[in-house]
Structure formats: structure tokens, C-alpha cells
């Protein structure tokens, strides 16, 4: 039975593949081992479900984060493009931005004459904002966006892998449970048959 859970088959992130029970009698040689075996399968099933919940939470965070990164990148690129045009009027840019989930407002952004002086502040999280030159900010945002998209792809693959393994483990648990029910019924019938024998 221990060899079932020591499978070397894993996905790219090291999540082990669920074993499939073809014949319960080959796994449980002694009926007294049923509880131990069933508990191991239940434990593995709960681990898969926990991993799936964790990956789904990661996907939810990434699906919120990616649009924010895309919007921030788009704004930074617009600022850089505006400064590249070298507008002679030196008039500030009028921007509309989201202040809250349901609240938008306007802002005037003064573009410095020298592009090297063009800087943006990026929220890094944990109430930390850093000021970056526009080109560095764009490179950082592109890298963060690519990393987030890669993480989303990986997490989505893991969720699908876990979903398949959860199904396999649920089938295994059902087969083990049904085997035990059948064994108990057979044992009960055998005991009743023995009672009916008269010597």
C-alpha cells in the first residue's frame, strides 16, 4: 500500500499524481488494514483540495493584478510618448483616473522639458511607493506583467492537474468504501448462514 503513495510521477511543480486502484483486493490484503488505507486516501484527497484552494486564490489575485499592471503600463507609455513628442506648448496633460472602485477624477500632469526628469511613482505594496524614471518604470512593469501572466498560466495548469487528481482520489475512496460495505455484507451473510446450520 505504501508503494501506491510513493509514485515518482509528478507534474512540473512537484505535485504527485494520484494513484488509481484497479483492484482493491490487491491493496488490502488484510481487512484490518482497511481503516489505515482509507484514512491515507482521505488524507491525500484533503491535501489535493487544500492545494487546489490555494491555487484558486492565487489565480483570483493574479486576475485582479494583471489588469492593474496593464493599465499602469499603458499610462506610463502614454506619458513617455507624450514627452517624446516634444510638444512645444508645454501644456499639462489632463488625465482621468480611478480614485476608488466607483470614483474617477481628473488630474493635470506637468511634463518636464527634459525627458530624464520624467518620473513616476509606483505602488509596490505594503504602503510603499517608489519613484522611478519613466523608462525604468516601464521595464519594471513589463517584467511584473510577464511574471504575473506566467504565474497565471502555471497556476491554471496546476488547478487542472489537481482537479483530475481529486476526481481520481474520490473514485478511489468510493471504491474502498464500497469494497468495505460488500465485505461486511458478505461477513454478515456468512454469520447468518452459520446460525441457520443445525447439527
Swiss-Prot record:
Keywords: Acetylation, Chaperone. One of its GO terms (cellular component) is prefoldin complex. GO terms for molecular function: tubulin binding. GO terms for biological process: microtubule-based process; protein folding; tubulin complex assembly. It comes from the Eukaryota. Coiled coil: none annotated. The modification N-acetylmethionine is found at residue 1. Belongs to the prefoldin subunit alpha family. PANTHER family: PREFOLDIN SUBUNIT 3. Binds specifically to cytosolic chaperonin (c-CPN) and transfers target proteins to it. Binds to nascent polypeptide chain and promotes folding in an environment in which there are many competing pathways for nonnative proteins. Heterohexamer of two PFD-alpha type and four PFD-beta type subunits. Present with 6550 molecules/cell in log phase SD medium. This is Prefoldin subunit 3. The gene is PAC10.
Amino acid at each position: 500500500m505504501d508503494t501506491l503513495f510513493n509514485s515518482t510521477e509528478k507534474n512540473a511543480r512537484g505535485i504527485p499524481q494520484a494513484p488509481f486502484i484497479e483492484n482493491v483486493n490487491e491493496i488490502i490484503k488484510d481487512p484490518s488494514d482497511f481503516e489505515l488505507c482509507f484514512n491515507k486516501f482521505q488524507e491525500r484527497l484533503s491535501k489535493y483540495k487544500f492545494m487546489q484552494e490555494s491555487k484558486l486564490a492565487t489565480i483570483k489575485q493574479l486576475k485582479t493584478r494583471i489588469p492593474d499592471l496593464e493599465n499602469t503600463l499603458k499610462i506610463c507609455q502614454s506619458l513617455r510618448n507624450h514627452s517624446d513628442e516634444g510638444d512645444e506648448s508645454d501644456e499639462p496633460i489632463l488625465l482621468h483616473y480611478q480614485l476608488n472602485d466607483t470614483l474617477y477624477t481628473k488630474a493635470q500632469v506637468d511634463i518636464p522639458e527634459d525627458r530624464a526628469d520624467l518620473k513616476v511613482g509606483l505602488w509596490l505594496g505594503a504602503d510603499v511607493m517608489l519613484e522611478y524614471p519613466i523608462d525604468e518604470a516601464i521595464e519594471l512593469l513589463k517584467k511584473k506583467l510577464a511574471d504575473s501572466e506566467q504565474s497565471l498560466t502555471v497556476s491554471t495548469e496546476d488547478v487542472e492537474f489537481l482537479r483530475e487528481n481529486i476526481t481520481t482520489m474520490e473514485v478511489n475512496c468510493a471504491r474502498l468504501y464500497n469494497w468495505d460495505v460488500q465485505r461486511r455484507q458478505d461477513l454478515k451473510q456468512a454469520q447468518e448462514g452459520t446460525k441457520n446450520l443445525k447439527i
